From Swiss-Prot:
Entry's family note: Belongs to the universal ribosomal protein uS2 family.
Pfam family for this entry, one: Ribosomal_S2
InterPro entries the UniProt entry points to: Ribosomal_uS2, Ribosomal_uS2_bac/mit/plastid, Ribosomal_uS2_CS, Ribosomal_uS2_flav_dom_sf
Name of the protein described by the UniProt record: Small ribosomal subunit protein uS2
Disulphide bridges, residue numbers: none
């Protein structure tokens, strides 16, 4: 789950946006500028990223769910891959308004998608070619819109967002519902309202991969720790029972 300063440098995490686009609220996290490009202070970014991973690990250990969000072109495949590896829901295409605040309606769409997939597996020979085409188009649209959250039965316990400026609606919905936010914030956006800020480049695919991999690793590690704790607890109970029986025999 560890990430080094060198890895951040190699991924280009320190490269911000052009100075003319900067958000003054990011001033505490900016080291300086070079060739009119802001340089993000990795001495700030690294410990803040570690804090975010620690939170993700603890939440996962407590059986919490983290929704991973990254719909920018350079983030889509990375987010989907890492979320699948970690076994958590994700949004990689577009954020549907009300995905959180109107989750009841979204659950209806999820139910529809699952029913259609079951119908597809059973075979579509009973309907006409035209109906099959309409069916195919609908299921493709549902897969694109909500495929990544089809196993999310309730609201997430936290959200990880790459590029807070690009996902303003998702952030507003999370804040409205009091859902904690982990967010990658570049030099041109505001960190205000983000619970776990990761100051860094949100455009480089290498940087995006570093963030997503780190959060996914933290989730997996937290889950593994939880399983180990359960195994230890069960083993301890078994040992206690054995001792009691032995004492009774004496």
């Amino acid at each position: 789950m560890s990430t080094s300063m060198r890895e951040m440098l190699e991924a280009g995490v320190h490269f911000g946006h052009q100075t003319r686009f900067w958000n003054p609220k990011m001033a505490p996290y900016i080291f300086g500028h070079r060739n009119r490009i802001h340089i993000i202070n990795l001495e700030k970014s690294l410990p803040m990223f570690q804090d975010a991973m620690k939170f993700a690990k603890q939440l996962s250990a407590n059986r919490g769910t983290i929704l991973m969000v990254g719909t920018k072109r350079q983030a889509r495949e990375i987010v989907a891959t890492e979320a699948k590896r970690a076994g958590v829901p994700y949004v990689d295409q577009r954020w549907l308004g009300g995905m959180l605040t109107n989750f009841k309606t979204v659950k209806t769409s999820i139910k529809r998608l699952k029913e259609m997939k079951a119908q597809q597996e059973a075979g579509l020979d009973s309907i006409s070619k035209k109906e099959q085409l309409t069916f195919k188009r609908e299921i493709e649209k549902l897969e694109k819109d909500i495929g990544g959250i089809q196993d999310m039965n309730a609201l997430p316990d936290a959200i990880f967002v790459i590029d807070v400026g690009f996902h303003k609606i998702a952030i507003l919905e999370a804040k409205k519902l009091g859902i904690p936010l982990i967010g990658v914030v570049d030099s041109n956006h505001s960190p205000i309202g983000i619970d776990y800020v990761i100051p860094g480049n949100d455009d480089s695919s290498k940087a995006v991969a570093l963030y997503a991999r780190g959060i996914a690793d933290a989730i997996l590690e937290g889950r593994a720790n939880a399983v180990n704790d359960v195994v230890k607890a069960v083993s301890a109970e078994s040992s206690d029972e054995f001792v009691e029986v032995e004492n009774a025999a004496n």
